[in-house]
Design a protein with these regions (language model features):
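Beta-strand/loop-rich accessory regions of lumenal/periplasmic or secreted enzymes
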Residues: 2-225
Length: 225
């Protein structure tokens, strides 16, 4: 049983993470953080900026979008991992987040949303506004590798390509199986890009054709996305 890769020490070829003001840097990449939301305000990959404006986690109620700003509090730092926590609340709800960036550029956000009273939520979404020139190609969420569509109303299931089985979208044929799963996407160019994957409290995605967990209630939304 190998113990390689268990520690936070970067593997050979990578450099230690560095933190300067609100910027975290790893090999070839720098992520600027919005100190009020904890989300990236800029992502530079080998000299190529990817974002046109800061990433936003939006909660929409009948009264409109929530304006929740907190304070980013560092919680741990090593050569291979930097972590922070964030919290914001109002009279209706409490939103907390734990964020981690690792030496290979992987960033993980774990959100917890707790209502303080009965509340009608119309939408919860993550917006990643990318520069047009930085995002000519798209792949994932049920789409093959292609030019980035102007509009795409996707869900967790695709009519004619998947069948619903035990809360999981299963491809109907081998020719469409490589489009599955629909929980992640990549958008970018031959120079740089962003890969985004949705996870859950007990959901970490499929494992080839052997392990196909049900999508989590937190974002599955009965297949509607």
């Amino acid at each position: 049983n190998s113990t390689l890769g268990i520690t936070d020490k970067p593997t050979v070829g990578y450099t230690d993470l560095s933190l300067e003001a609100n910027k975290v840097s790893c090999l070839g990449r720098t992520v600027g953080l919005d100190m009020q939301t904890g989300l990236p305000s800029s992502i530079d990959s080998w000299g190529h900026e990817l974002l046109s404006s800061p990433v936003r986690f939006i909660i929409r109620t009948d009264a409109g979008d929530k304006k929740l700003n907190g304070t980013l509090v560092p919680s741990g730092q090593s050569g291979g991992k930097i972590s922070a926590t964030w919290k914001a609340e109002d009279a209706d709800l409490l939103l907390t987040c734990q964020g981690t960036m690792e030496f290979d550029g992987w960033i993980n956000y774990v959100y917890s949303l707790s209502p303080k009273k009965d509340l009608q939520i119309k939408d919860i979404r993550l917006e990643i506004p990318m520069l047009t020139d930085a995002a000519p190609y798209f792949m994932g969420l049920g789409l093959p590798g292609q030019e980035t569509p102007v509009n795409y109303a996707g869900g967790w299931e695709t009519q004619g390509k998947t069948v619903h089985d035990y809360a999981v979208s299963i491809p109907t044929s081998k020719s469409t199986s490589w489009l599955w799963p629909f929980d992640s996407f990549w958008c970018g160019s031959e120079k740089a890009g962003i890969h985004c994957e949705l996870r859950g409290a007990t959901y970490t995605g499929p494992l080839l054709n052997l392990y196909r967990p049900a999508y989590p209630d937190s974002w599955y939304n009965n297949g509607k996305g």
